[in-house]
Amino acid sequence: MADLNAIADQIQGLTLLEASQLVKMLEEKLGVSAAAAVAAPAAGGGAAAAAPAAEEKTEFTVVLTGAGANKINVIKAVREVTSLGLKEAKDLVDGAPKPIKEGVSKEEAATIAKKFTDAGATVEVK
């Protein structure tokens, strides 16, 4: 069998026009189409690459859905997590459902959700 490294080096040294001619020549001799072979793996690879990205979410949003009976404790929790002023925190709690914090990690979202649940609020992690 021919030395594959030598063949690879020769192909690497081809110009774009020569590479195109080589592809056409191989298509004719082997009776295949390079366009179909190239398109199929690209489509399959793209779909396979998109699926894990949808499964592994890395950024979460914590949404306050309700203040509950202990509104003052919830306002304090909002101020701790977001460093908003008293008026802004009260407006956020009164305007629920509203996002408290966006683009946080799963662990941080769980910590924030627990803090609000302990304060008497209802939260949702998206």
Swiss-Prot record:
Record-level Gene Ontology MF annotations: mRNA binding; structural constituent of ribosome
Tagged with keyword Protease: no
InterPro entries with a match to the protein in the record: Ribosomal_bL12, Ribosomal_bL12_C, Ribosomal_bL12_C/ClpS-like, Ribosomal_bL12_oligo, Ribosomal_bL12_oligo_N_sf
Cellular component GO terms held in the UniProt record: cytoplasm; ribonucleoprotein complex; ribosome
Source organism superkingdom: Bacteria
Biological role: Forms part of the ribosomal stalk which helps the ribosome interact with GTP-bound translation factors. Is thus essential for accurate translation.
Quaternary structure (record): Homodimer. Part of the ribosomal stalk of the 50S ribosomal subunit. Forms a multimeric L10(L12)X complex, where L10 forms an elongated spine to which 2 to 4 L12 dimers bind in a sequential fashion. Binds GTP-bound translation factors.
Family to which this protein belongs: Belongs to the bacterial ribosomal protein bL12 family.
HAMAP family assigned: Ribosomal_bL12
NCBIfam families, alphabetized: L12
Protein name: Large ribosomal subunit protein bL12
Gene source species: Solibacter usitatus (strain Ellin6076)
Designated gene of the protein: rplL
